[in-house]
Amino acid sequence: MRIIIVLLAFFISLSGFSQVNGNTAKLQRPKLVVGIAVDQMRWDYLYRYYDRYGNDGFRRLLNGGYSCENTMINYLPSLTAVGHTVVFTGSVPALSGITGNDWMDQLTGKTVYCTSDSTVQGVGGSSPNEGKMSPRNLLVTTITDELRIATNFRSKVVGVSLKDRASILPAGHSANAAFWFEDASGHFITSTYYMNQLPDWATRFNNSNIIDSLIVKGWNTLYPINTYKQSDPDNVPYEGKFVGEQAPVFPHPIKEIYASNKSSIRNTPFGNTLTLQFAKAALDGYNLGRGEATDFLTINFACTDGVGHMYGPNSIEIEDTYLRLDKDLANLFQTLDQKVGKGQWLLFLTADHGAANTVGFMQEHKLPGELTSPSRLVDSLNRRLNELFQVSGLVRSISNNMVNFDVNRIYSSALDFDAIKKAAVDFLQRQPEIVIAVDISKVGESPVPEPLKTMIGNSYYFKRSGSVLIVAKSGQLEAFYKTGTSHSKWNPYDTHIPFILYGWNIKPGRLNRTVNMSDIAPTIAALLHIQMGSGSVGQVVTEVIPAK
């Protein structure tokens, strides 16, 4: 009996010891999360070029990861700043405040850029006045913010892109750093929001002249040009060209073009490779994925957007850009395997938006497509409203698919705003290029079909949004895009995007039900066992969460 009592006392003391010192079981998380947004990547690019991809890039993700095949944007407009915000917050423009790449302040009439911040200065660039950027216009937290909070800020978060908005907004408010490319200097820069000087490794990278080595041979096709059978012929009238070129054909003399215009790197695949190399330098510079807490690296490959805008989705240039990006991704995955460890990193790949086919391509193949002029529409709408209300200039502009009224003039003139909006809707719906015009405050009672009705509701933030929304005919682009393409509309070519999860705790699979872009962040939160962002409205993709 004495022995039993002694043993009981011993085990009770062990139990007390374990309670004091904590359970030895540790919450499992990946060492590193990598969030990739491929700018302007239509979902169909995964399969259009599938037979040409290697085994270690896109195919590695598709064959070894979990692909949500019907991931859709659930708001308007489908633009870069908004897309990156929704991906990394799980929110929508109505709550996040990021309603476009820029927007008109409805009270002042001033145009505001999404990441502009006059209280900070640029760091590492040509001038402190360049790079005055931060996430302060973002009204909610990101998944990257929530990871920092969950680990008591032991996690490190870094954003990388050629575009400021595609680095700053994903990295969130509390990021250790966000870096982007400055055309004037040809360097990656940041702002005093994050730091007062560039890290030594970033300065060394900027001084390494890596761009010169990437463009020294110009831009020719990666493979023989006659193998690019998924694309138009090389010389078509609806593709753009660089200044100085006689025709939009290979080879493109990028070395000479870049010497006089550094922004031209954005319209080549080499800017993606530059982004990859800087991201790898940041991986080492911040020792990401090698500490005690989970780190997060966000990467935007922006040149798929630049090439798409210039040449369009059916060009040899865009096909070549994706074949080269496939190799860049393979390089990144190999680096992660070596430096973080196979199975130790979690990655997701998505896009901020898609793109329309060029108008010339559509017309050539007898498909719906035409050019339109928002400025002409503003002029004619103002004339009509002046006839009805005897006050000129009631409409300031049309942007982000919305009509921006001069609300100060309307109220100071004692006009009925509802009557003005009704008159605007009546006029706009009679225009041949418009399918739907709707007063956003009345969209709930309108005959607008789903999913458009929900998309419109998700888009409206009064201080930064116009009051009447326009839905244009399918295939329409602004008159500026006589060559190349653009995006911003509700149509599937703009809103059907890839979403693939790969790596830590992810089993291969396919999901064909509809998933919204706003579901991405809460799904990552669930995988990491952390809180969703403060404005999250998305749903967890439960099919990808491992069973207990």
Say what each PLM segment does.
Residues I265-G291, T304-W345, A423, I524:
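A long, amphipathic alpha-helix that forms part
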Residues V20-Y66:
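Active-site-proximal N-terminal segment of extracellular/periplasmic enzymes that hydrolyze or transfer
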Residues M1-A25:
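Bacterial Sec-dependent N-terminal signal peptides
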